[in-house]
Swiss-Prot record:
This is Non-reducing polyketide synthase 8. It comes from Pestalotiopsis microspora. Its EC number is 2.3.1.-. Residues 1498-1646 are annotated as: C-terminal hotdog fold. Residues 405-840 form the Ketosynthase family 3 (KS3) domain. Induction: The expression of the dibenzodioxocinones biosynthesis cluster is positively regulated by the transcription factor dibT. Keywords: Multifunctional enzyme, Phosphopantetheine, Phosphoprotein, Transferase. One of its GO terms (biological process) is fatty acid biosynthetic process. Residues 1404-1642 are annotated as: Dehydratase (DH) domain. The modification O-(pantetheine 4'-phosphoryl)serine is found at S1778.
Amino acid sequence: MRPTTPSTTESPDNFSNMKLLYFSNEFPHDDLAGLSRQLTLLSKQKQFPHLARFLDHATEAVRDEVRQLPWSLRNTIPSFDSVFNFIEHASLRKGELGASIDGVLLVVVQLGTLIKYYEENPKKYDLNTGNAALSGLGLGLLSTAAVSLSSSVSDLAVAGVEVVRLAFRLGVVVGSVSSNLESRDPTSPPVSWAAVVPDVTVDEARDELDAFYAREKMPSTSKIFISAWSHNSVTISGPPSRLKHLFRTSEFFRGQKIINLPVYGGLCHAAHLYNQEHVREVVSETDSLKELSSRASPKLTTFATSTGKRFEAETARELFEQIVAEIMTKEIRWGTVVDSVLAQAHTTSCSDIQVLVFRKSLPVYDLLTAFSSKQPGLEVSTLELIPTIPASLDNGTPVSGGSSKSSIAIVGMSCRMPGGATDTESFWNLLEKGMDVHRTIPADRFDIDTHHDPKGKAMNSSHTAYGCFIDEPGLFDAPFFNMSPREAQQTDPMQRLALVTAYEALERAGYVANRTPATSLERIGTFYGQASDDYREVNTAQEISTYFIPGGCRAFGPGRINYFFKFAGPSFSIDTACSSSLATIQTACTSLWNKDTDMAVAGGMNVLTNSDAFAGLSHGHFLTKTPNACKTWDSEADGYCRADGIGSIVMKRLEDAIADNDNIIGVIRGAATNHSAEAVSITHPHAGAQSFLSSKVLSAAGIDPFDVSYVEMHGTGTQAGDKEEMKSVTDVFAPAGPKRRSMRQPLHVGAVKANVGHGEAVAGVTALIKVLLMFQKSMIPPHVGIKNSLNPALPSDLAERNVRIPYTRQAWPREKDRKRIAAVNNFSAAGGNTMIAIEEPPLPRNIAPEDEDPRTTHAVTVSAKSKVSLEGNLKRLIAFLENNPDVRMSDLAYTTAARKYHHNHRIAVAAADVPQLKKKLSAQLNSIDSVKSISNLQPLIAFAFTGQGASYKSMDLQLFHHEPTFRSQILHLNSLALAQGFPSFLPAVDGSFPKDHAHSAVVTQMALVAIEISLAAYWASLGVVPNVVVGHSLGEYAALYVAGVLSASDAIYLVGQRARLLEERVQAGSHKMMAVRASLADIQKIAAGMPYEVACINGPRDTVLSGLSKDLDTLIEPLQKAGFKCYSLDVAYAFHSSQTDPILEEFGELAETGAIFHAPKLPVLSPLLGKVIFDEKTLNATYMKRATRECVNYLAAVETGAKLSLVDDNTLWVEIGPHPVCINMSKSSLRSVGAAVPSMRRDESNWATMAQSLSTLHCAGATIRWNEFHKPFEKGLRLLDLPTYAWNNKNYWIQYNGDWALTKGNTYYDAQKKALETAKALPAPRLSDLKTSSVQRIIEESFDGSAGTVVMQSDLMEADFLAAAHGHKMNGCGVVTSSIHADISYTLGSYLLKKMSPSSGDIAMNVADLEVVKGLVAQKNTKVPQMIQVSISTENINTGTAQLRWQNVNAQGIPDEPFATATLEYGDRSAWLSSWVPQTHLIQGRIEALETLAAQGIANRLSHNMAYLLFANNLVDYATKYRGMQSVVINGLEAFADVTLTTEKGGVWTVPPYFIDSVAHLAGFVMNVSDAIDTKANYCVTPGWSSMRFAKPLVAGAKYRSYVKMIPTVEDRSVYLGDVYVLQDNEIIGIVGGIKFRQYPRILLNRFFSAPDEASPSPNPTHGATAKAQAQPKTIAASHGDEKHFATSVQISTPSKIGHQLIVKPVAIQAPPPAGPVVVALKDPEVQGSPVVVASAAAAVDTNSVASKAISMIANEAALEQADLQDEASFAELGIDSLMSLVISEKLREELGVVVSGSLFLEYPTIGDLRSWLMEYYG
């Protein structure tokens, strides 16, 4: 049907008025975000249903278009739930898809606004009945098409969605074509492709452009052109760099005003770039377009902007094609549109015209001006639509109910059920067999003999001894889930199994993260039901440790699933008692319906270990006392049997599941939850509420109750519950009224609890999985709950109502005329009711012949995280093939590669059929031990681009015929070639000629480069992107394109022009090229004096010569006689020889003006220069000219790349070309390569080559986007339900011991309290009268000649000692300062000397080499002793030295490992003073210099109060008597202080600690206050010093001056050293030498300096302690925020067996056993990675080294085997999380003195990394 609008030649009835709708190419509002918000809010109101539908469907259309994009583009688009989300993504709108995104936004805003206007004013939509016309600019023309095709607002909402699709596709095509002209730099701001030049006529602009073309030779595709013009301005478009060059070099344009337009997406209105193929690419034949074309045709005149004429279109498709062609290929001449509008107004004799616009703009003003000047009598009005949208909306406006709900597809499921059901198949087996799997409560839960009393009299006991239990619920593959054994053991097994079943369900669903929009990580949520915390309450509560909270609290179950899979959607743990899992699934459905998520993982979990719940439910009369699962509907039903269970399902909206090619196993049509508010009690069921719920769900889903053929009932086996539920079901699904079920529509009912008991929180998902299995098996399993007779309380007319209880298996086949629908009930003891209506899955779609996968060879992959699992996965796949010999290879390859996660142990094989595949997989099974784990680091990838002559003259490329990315790129490049005046090169690639047919040089060479550019694009789409490129001869053009140096257009231009010049200037065949298998030196020696030229040096023994044919022929004989093979290359010209001389100058000129050379984005290995090119100057026209003539030294290029580490032994080499040549050169030139693969081979199918190459790269560690590989063929592929992952399980289980759950008594602390009392009652004996505040009691002294030992003990809680500690507070805790340790040293040193040498007189003492490995922090409880022990000993007092050791003493009086050591040296005061004299003037000079700097305002002078205020704020809060510094001058890390010692007395001391601190803590002040240190993020503490010497006593009230300069050490920049000088009256009287400070993150302050009794019980005693002490469990405190966590050490050396389960009991860690034979992963120089057996650990590694001890400690803390700690193992994979890392870091610091930061395991992510660091710095 043609438009009814009149033309100038054919005039219908005149209309008195006319309407013109104008759609601009500019956004109609400056605040686009605000406008979109208003449209969104309006769409939620009842009066705008069409607007709501349009916005919703437009979003779905864009989502569908995104799904079709190649990954490189798809990955740039974030997840979205509305197209308006894009507005906020500025970078997206200016990126590669900017044109698509802005085009969509423009169309949606325009049409959305128009729909809103006409919904508000429905009578005004009379466009197709009156004199109306449409006009638009650019993309605005697309919006006119939607209006032209629509008879109503409802039609407009539909047609508008198709226009949104076109706008998106148009941007994609424009971006693709434009990027071939000039690629954009994603790291730089976007640049404009168009500029307006005002006040210039079109003729002036054309003349100047013609002159520019005459000066500059360039490809026609790159030319600047006029895209739009009017009477007073011109828009000039072109590649940005060309535009910039024009405006910079043209004298004419330099004098004009240039306004760059925000056109960032590419070029339109370019007839030289686009053709009808591009138009068809945009207006592709889709189902939605077919439907629209079948029911809509153009109804209104739409003016073309190039001619002003109307579009003559009969169908929607024709109209779209004409408009898209207008946008892509035609100039905008707005004046012609203005003239046509005036003509129509005149022809129709209208008296008034209304112009509808979104807002006024220049084109509108031009139109209005024309009306007023040329038709002054015409009454013209304008209506701006944007102002009709209110700025704000009334919150009270009624809101619509929203769009209709989608059905929800279940696409994956997994379970662990009682009775040994470890998967859904074994679960079905027990259902099908009618098994009742109840059993006596197993011993791994609790002792049934003590916790069960059938009479119910024993306190806290269970009345029942039965339950239904999962076998070995502790089985878990901890390393797979990156959990340490310690974390796994302390994590609730139901949460672990939820994680496992979630993985399996996702695996069966074919889930791969971000594969499609519906699998975007940001749009996936996790929903699980859980109603108990047994394991946390009982098992882990026996010894609370690090993972007590994250391993046991319910929220962490779904949270851990989200964390492991990196889902960023919501995670919910829901407790509605018995209905938890189905209520959770309903919540997940709601989330999907509301589009809060696009995919949901949901389910429930229950593992029973707490006897309290059994006791409570027994006393509440819930549980049966008899041995059965549940006697559902039995006359003697007396309650339910508790059960374990874990179930997980994966859900999507149905349309998304279909689009994602998922296996749909069931379809949820409706779901809802209500509450039995009218029940007689909260736990009593209510039939009315249940019936109401069922009716509500069926009504909302549009389901006739009689269409439901099965109801899976809650069926707990209670008298009240069974009666009420059966009544509610029969009332709704099988009523007794006049309308009854026919005999053809029986209603079967069942209850899974009769088989596996009542799983409580997991009951709902258990029932749902049963129904899903019934759909799969087309079978209803027997109901086994009736043990005696049918419950007489049930309706007596069940048979008459056609309600059937299946006592035996019943067939439930698909029917042709109706779908199988089931209902699943799940009720809560707390009163909640949930019901789900579920329909059978749709039948798999038939695969049309044209959709069959054309590939003949396929890559099948198998992977795992361990070799054990890899072997298991491989065996499972082989078994699957044995059982399914007819499986299609394409489906198998698709499922294993594109629809599975890939792990670090990989196998991949290429095969053409199943027998071949089985043979290859079996071979792999026999060599499983040789499979190496790939590194987490991606290997380097090098692209090598082939030169000419490697393939047939004519090719027939399967990639061109079948692969869209490759084909599209070839076609685009061919279009460029045609546009540049060259012949098409398609005949050289499409098989239209025999393979030996010789094409022209132009065709052949362009075809080669085009193939290589397209191959690179294809590899990139598969995720294989180079880190470095090298091109051989002609291949260098493609290499430079990939490196970003040349655009595709310029590469084609240069290659075509070079080939044209060869054809025109050079005689083909006069010269030849000859390959010689010899080195250049060999050839030079043999062919000395003979004429030849060296064309290529391809390898150490691979050279190509060029020259006259006759000259090279004479070389053959001597070379062959010398044993060197020679063969001529099949090329028409001798490249890189004198034959090319005639073309060089002209080619250089063409390259100079015709191509733009950019700086490479990748390193380029240059065969011309033998160098690596990084800069922007080397690659230019001169380079291209030289590369044509000079030698190709491929060998030098590759060797240079290796020297610069751009390629290494693990680099993956990919040959980009029609046949492998370069990769062989690379292998011969390098020591080793990781892998080398071709893209194509002669005489081999492209798909066979690609399958093998992808398999090789995959196994070598490359990340292949397998989905992109299979995506073009997905219509012909099916997802297979393959075997799930073969877990490498171990049993992680903490056994509940004893009967404390019965007694509720806790005797844990009794022994400790008794020991404390004993310690108080029996103090250590005093052996001496010596008593000071710090040395309170000598408990041991022994002297033997010149050897002697003195041991003292002191209680830190003694008043003076405690006051001294509290005088030095850190983190609010009293900390024993090092000056107290110094006083103890001086006291004991003096005592020892007097005892052993009474006549020694006044001897000075040096406290040397003090090292404090752990701070001594005062406990909070002052009523309990806190004992320390310090010993001083000397082997020979005559040496003048003695050794000191500090130890904590536990409550049993046993000393722990030393926490500090020092050496006491006796010396001569006078000698010290004399030795210090030379340094005095130096120190004085530095002090004076600081004074000068302070006077100049450079250094800071701080008062007494300010100094200690800063000190207290940053780290240490000193008591008054410690505050000796009166003023401080500080500059960077240098300072001096004036000190006055306090006269305040307090305690008995040898050298008061507040004296020592006052003169020495200037160093600590500098390290914690100086602006040279990041004191905000870090703090510094001293672990000791080299020496502390005072030649004169420190005197109360005396004045001193201290000076220090701290310097960072070279070895460790976090460690600082300095000397503190103490001066009195300008004389050095003391030095604290080599004082050391170490920097720590401030976040660890709480961890290091907390009172010990705030964290954990006493530390574990040493190995020499008593047996009683060894029995104490060891706990390590790890602070995380304000919480305290405890890590319990667990030994697995003395397990007890219960059944088949390994029960691990918490015990103390014993001394490690002697080292036995071990296997150490030492690399054999010949066989990489081969293990070497050594006799013992000591022979392989130094077990006493810090590194070895640290690795052992990590194994111990994480409960890992030493064998697990191989160098390549990453801490993340071993499960060392943030909590565990804090525990280990503290242990390393405490026990080994290794000071580490909290980021240790991030900085050194693998065992090998950490071991190397420890060996380097600690040994």
